[in-house]
């Protein structure tokens, strides 16, 4: 085996559900199986994600030391998202969503450093990352060799809170009027699968 992955769907950690599903953090011991209703603590969640970035980088470095021919990638859930309208407010909301859900993890793991937009995203959520000495060097020296992703559906983003949310969409978003939905509420978008091939990293 020459191709390896570190964490599965690592970017699910940017969503509240990711604390339990991706990091194993359980804040409500009385209701351990109701993961969508677990109390969300962004500081805890993004700090955990930082540790995952460091662990992934160390794994990449170790794999290359074991066998220089090994290739190690990351793995994300790609949340294809479009502005609901051409209203500039919708476009900006969608840009912010894509940065958080689709670019944040890939940028750190592919470039080996936090992107410039990370500061404003984290500040808005009240998150201040605690970094250990050497973390930045570890990230820099442990970049992934390739990017992989899973894809299920797409959604639209809007600044209008009155729009109807997509049923079954655990990553957030509203219904796309141009798409049909499955029986469980996920909108069917085969074209959306083409989208990530040019947009999984921000390009800085």
Q: Could you say what each language-model-derived stretch is?
A:
Residues 1-204:
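Active-site region of glycoside hydrolase catalytic domains
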């Amino acid at each position: 085996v020459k191709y390896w992955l570190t964490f599965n769907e690592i970017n699910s950690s940017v969503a509240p559900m990711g604390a339990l599903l991706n990091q194993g953090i359980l804040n409500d011991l009385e209701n351990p199986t109701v993961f969508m209703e677990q109390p969300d603590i962004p500081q805890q969640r993004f700090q955990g994600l930082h540790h995952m970035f460091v662990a992934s980088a160390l794994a990449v470095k170790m794999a290359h030391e074991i066998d220089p021919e090994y290739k190690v990638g990351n793995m994300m859930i790609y949340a294809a998202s479009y502005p609901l309208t051409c209203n500039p407010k919708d476009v900006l909301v969608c840009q912010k969503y894509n940065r958080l859900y689709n670019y944040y993890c890939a940028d750190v793991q592919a470039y080996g450093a936090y992107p410039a937009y990370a500061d404003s995203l984290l500040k808005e959520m009240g998150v201040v990352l605690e970094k250990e000495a050497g973390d930045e060097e570890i990230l820099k020296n442990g970049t992934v060799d390739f990017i992989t992703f899973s894809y299920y559906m797409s959604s639209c983003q809007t600044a209008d809170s009155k729009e109807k949310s997509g049923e079954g969409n655990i990553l957030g978003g509203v219904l796309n009027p141009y798409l049909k939905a499955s029986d469980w509420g996920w909108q069917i978008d085969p074209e959306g699968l083409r989208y990530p091939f040019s947009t999984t990293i921000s390009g800085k």
